[in-house]
Amino acid sequence: MRCPNCNSLDTQVKDSRPTEDSSVIRRRRVCIACNFRFTTFERVQLRELTVIKRNGRRVPFDRDKLVRSVQISLRKRPVEPERVEQLVSAIVRELESSGEADISSETIGEIVMDHLRKLDDVAYVRFASVYRNFREAKDFEAVLGELSGEEEARPTLVRK
């Protein structure tokens, strides 16, 4: 592993452990040349994914871009970073296990929205507003109406 500080290839793993859900290995490393310490993460990649953009352009799937967009929708929400990582890992696992190497950006957006809807309503609305390109207040009202309908359909816990 190349040192991010001095670009030396002479690094050493000092500590290695799985994350809570065991889907990622976290490694603490030290550069022998400059003594810089850094962390790397190792995860399984089932297949190389290609995203087909709305304009037809093909780009390699970028997990970090997915993480950033989920984090933006969850900004200032009471969701732990570990939960975000679990959510992103679940989305990537779903994409990789679909059997398709080429996936449309629309499909990815719908999968992200499904996962966010289960996690946090506010994050879901935020993501939907960008993904679906909301232009008017009625666009928000429609999504909020969907969420309200789901809330009414869910059984409520009655306390005595």
Curated annotation (Swiss-Prot):
Ranges annotated as biased composition (Polar residues): 1-11
Keyword Zinc-finger: yes
Ranges for domain ATP-cone: 49-139
Cofactor binding description: Binds 1 zinc ion.
Signal peptide stretch: none
Pfam family, one: Zn_ribbon_NrdR
MF-aspect GO terms: ATP binding; DNA binding; zinc ion binding
Protein's UniProt name: Transcriptional repressor NrdR
Record organism: Rhodopseudomonas palustris (strain BisB5)
Gene name per UniProt: nrdR
